[in-house]
Amino acid sequence: MLLWLFEQLAGYHSSFQVVRYLTLRSLLSVLTSLTIGLVLGPIMIRKLQALKYGQAVSSFAPENHAKKMGTPTMGGILILLSIGISTLLWADLSNPYVWIVLGVMVVFGAVGWADDWIKIRYKDNAGLPARKKFFWTSVASLGAGIALYLIATQQSNAEYTANMLDLLIPFFKNLSIPLSIVPLGLAFIVFTYLVINGASNAVNLTDGLDGLAIMPVVMVATGLGVFAYLSGDIRFANYLHIPYVKYTSELVVICSAMIGAGLAFLWYNAHPAQVFMGDVGALALGAMLGTIAVMVRQEIVFAIMGGVFVMEAVSVFLQIGSLRMRNKRVFLMAPLHHHYEKQGWKETQVVIRFWIITIMLVVLGLMTLKLR
């Protein structure tokens, strides 16, 4: 929005052209979302307290979680609001990738909001019926996959189209799984669906301790922002042997907004948390990360950088599978962070150690740019 305005003003004075620079707009995006989150945070917390939108604690949760009862939830609304405003202000709104990510954010955020609201309003931990949740998240993720496929196939360069659809294998030069050979982009669309929904649910499962999910989200968004910047520049992409994708540079503005909004939320979510993000935040943020990973064609690297999210999700699958097949537990409690709590780790120890793991994994993900 402001990019368009400054482009009009550039005709009157050349100094307005400075806003065209992606690096400046990305920095302004961070500062804008950070400021919005910090300023509106106390207001949002007071409003949630007044509405009595407090967190319910499961009877199966570790004993030390009882003190979290009543802490305001649905704080993810503030995160999404900060990201949305910052993106609309500083991103190039003619870029289709910007609107796809925002669309995914809105739909997954709405599903998360409905899930949170039902849990609070009706004291029902089941939340939104699984069929409705599945339907709307499927609409958003499949819609994103179809849109990305159509954008890719509009290009006249067949090699470029293949680069936008095939699954890149990290640590190797020019090695990929050819999803593009399946007619009508079915393999690509289904794979996109799995990545977006998998990321959304994995982040949601991770969001069980104060600050545990939001900081890895910030770190992974930073890593994806680097890939978005490099893959959107044909010179960097060719030099680093990564796919050049025409529209991805503008995703840096969105990643920057996620970083600023996430850090602002962490200010109030740090232990002891004053507010929780709820499903409205976790589902949307995970879906956004998954969508951006698909756009920059770095799904496997995304799984590496988001290894904490992967471990949390896998721990739940293993626990459920083992209980059904063997009637035995693999972990003391799932997701994984609760297992370590049961072993005697303090909440802050679990959180900070998972942050450290994420830092190392994001660095490893970035190393794939040169280790080929």
Curated annotation (Swiss-Prot):
Disulfide bonds: none
Transmembrane feature ranges: 25-45, 73-93, 98-118, 134-154, 176-196, 211-231, 251-271, 275-295, 300-320, 349-369
GO biological process: cell division; cell wall organization; peptidoglycan biosynthetic process; regulation of cell shape
CDD domains in alphabetical order: GT_MraY
Pfam families: Glycos_transf_4
Membrane topology: Multi-pass membrane protein
EC number: 2.7.8.13
Family: Belongs to the glycosyltransferase 4 family. MraY subfamily.
Protein name as it appears in the record: Phospho-N-acetylmuramoyl-pentapeptide-transferase
Species this protein is from: Acinetobacter baumannii (strain AYE)
